[in-house]
Amino acid sequence: MSIFPVWAEINLRAIAHNIREIRRVTEPGAKVMAVVKANAYGHGAEEVSQTALAGGAEWLGVARVAEGVSLRQAGIEAPVLVLGYTTPEQAADVIRHNLSQTVYTRNAALFLAEAAAREGKRARVHFKVDTGMGRIGWLAGPGAVREILELARLPQLEVEGIFTHFAAADAADKRYTLEQFQKFIEMIDELQKNGLEFPLRHAANSAAIMELPGTHLDMVRAGIILYGLYPSDEVDRRRIDLRPAMSLKARVAHVKEVPAGFKVSYGCTYTTGRPGVIATLPLGYADGYSRLLSSKGEALIHGRRAPVVGRVCMDQVMVDVSGIPGVKAGDEAVLIGRQGGETISADEVAAKLGTINYEVTCMVSGRVPRVYIR
């Protein structure tokens, strides 16, 4: 058990297993990008990156320049693609730290080229095409082809790749995704007819890695499946064996017997119906255990489920342990993960919150220590 009152346990052996599975289902010849943005979906970017690279990933993906710089400062030398927006003021950091940058407007290409010229280097770029997601990217079409061809001639830019992102690959109906992919391929064909070649063409996200091998091209981008979670309930889970890497745990801080009619937590929204036992756990919404789990969430203590009672506080939450004999201060409580024969999954927590498993792991805040199992 950890020395901390609350901690997130990250099983790097699970990450290593998942990257092996991702490699197994990825088409031969396609590289694997491990997407480690948002502190590796809450799991710890440095440790996950090192584990993924050791397991066969060739690239890393981040959302922001600062995330890429942090990886470089940790001694990670693998190629890193900044998938999102970078300000003109940060362009020099892209060059200095040998990052690759997503480009999706003329202005972005120009300020990156200017920064590269000042540094006496070339900027590595991946052009982003919007084939139906509605986020960043040139809208696929003749106008985009003309502009990309023009910008690719800038001597300060080294064109490494071109990519798009699927909006609904995790749906059972793949028609929209295949339409997006067709637009992407048609645009690449037009660019190639005009003499522009791309070392790396990439489109496949986690769901497409699992179910659409024809979209794997030169590289795939593994996000949520790297962490052992499935993209949705509509994908075929039999295609890949995943192991969840994160558990959220705490130690029981206090246990007290309370009478019937006793009110618990802010707003007095919960009243005991009979005499019972309430345990306090030292985590709350400041740790990423959402207030929306008030009187909805559960914890595992002694391998049994204890319901959250009353409102989740900033730093504490109360659970009813009346039906669990012998609970005492210092006992382990599991908010996400397995204890004994019971499991509370990130998907279960997400369902109670009306959200997705991605958000559940990302919500675990920075003040929660990560404890790594190697």
Curated annotation (Swiss-Prot):
EC number(s) on file: 5.1.1.1
According to its UniProt entry, one GO biological process term is:
peptidoglycan biosynthetic process
Positions annotated to bind substrate: R135, M314
Metabolic or biological pathway, per its Swiss-Prot or TrEMBL entry: Amino-acid biosynthesis; D-alanine biosynthesis; D-alanine from L-alanine: step 1/1
SMART domains listed in its UniProt record:
Ala_racemase_C
> Which Gene Ontology cellular-component terms appear in the entry?
cytosol
Which cofactors are named for this entry?
pyridoxal 5'-phosphate
Q: Which UniProt keywords apply?
A: Isomerase, Pyridoxal phosphate
- Catalysed reactions, as listed in the record: L-alanine = D-alanine
- Gene Ontology molecular function: any one: pyridoxal phosphate binding
- Residues annotated as carrying N6-(pyridoxal phosphate)lysine in the record are K37
Highest taxon above the source species: Bacteria
Q: What class of enzyme is it?
A: isomerase
Q: Per its UniProt record, what InterPro entries does this chain match?
A: Ala_racemase, Ala_racemase/Decarboxylase_C, Ala_racemase_C, Ala_racemase_N, Ala_racemase_pyridoxalP-BS, PLP-binding_barrel
Q: Which residues form the active site?
A: K37 (proton acceptor), Y266 (proton acceptor)
Q: Where are the transmembrane segments?
A: none
Q: What does this protein do?
A: Catalyzes the interconversion of L-alanine and D-alanine. May also act on other amino acids.
Similarity remark: Belongs to the alanine racemase family.
Task: Specify the protein name.
Answer: Alanine racemase
Gene this chain is encoded by: alr
